[in-house]
Regions:
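Glycine-rich ThDP/TPP pyrophosphate-binding loop and its adjacent helix/strand module
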Residues: 1-156
Length: 156
């Protein structure tokens, strides 16, 4: 709702900046998110882009089992948003989605980014237990080694 207020303020003030907000699939279980989404579409806030991290995990388990907001794309479309679905692990898809969102007129845009929680760290991938937990020293070293190896592969 803060991002919606910022986007509305920009529109009313004749400003050209865009507003971006990041939401989790667990977070969008909250009513305030949908009230803001409805308002943003009603006001045609095409300067607003919401990126929804869709990994189906939250601190207490599977998003679908706790309080399912699925199907997310259809819900945002029903609320009057432009929807772009991407793989959150593809830099090309991320870049294209932000470009498309910035060019779309008349509606706010929701980028639904399908992701894997902890991607790139073998013992963290797809585990909700890491939502609010810090790794110990040994785990940290292993995680950094795995991420550095992945980075080296990308740069090769």
């Amino acid at each position: 709702s803060t991002a919606v207020g910022m986007a509305l303020g920009a529109k009313l003030g004749g400003k050209s900046f865009r507003v971006y907000t990041a939401l989790g699939d667990g977070e969008i279980q909250e009513g305030q998110v949908w009230e803001a989404a409805m308002f943003a579409a009603a006001k045609g806030l095409d300067n607003l882009t919401a990126v929804i991290d869709n990994n189906n995990l939250q601190i207490d388990g599977s998003v679908a089992e706790v309080n399912s907001p699925y199907p997310i794309p259809e819900k945002f479309r029903a609320f009057g948003w432009n929807v772009i679905e991407i793989c959150a692990h593809s830099f090309d898809e991320i870049d294209a989605a932000f470009k498309a969102a910035s060019e779309f007129k008349g509606k706010p845009t929701a980028i639904i980014a399908k992701s894997i929680k902890g991607k790139g760290v073998s013992f963290m991938e797809d585990q909700c237990s890491w939502h609010g937990t810090a790794p110990n020293s040994e785990q940290y070293e292993q995680a950094m080694a795995e991420l550095q190896a992945a980075l080296a592969e990308l740069e090769a």
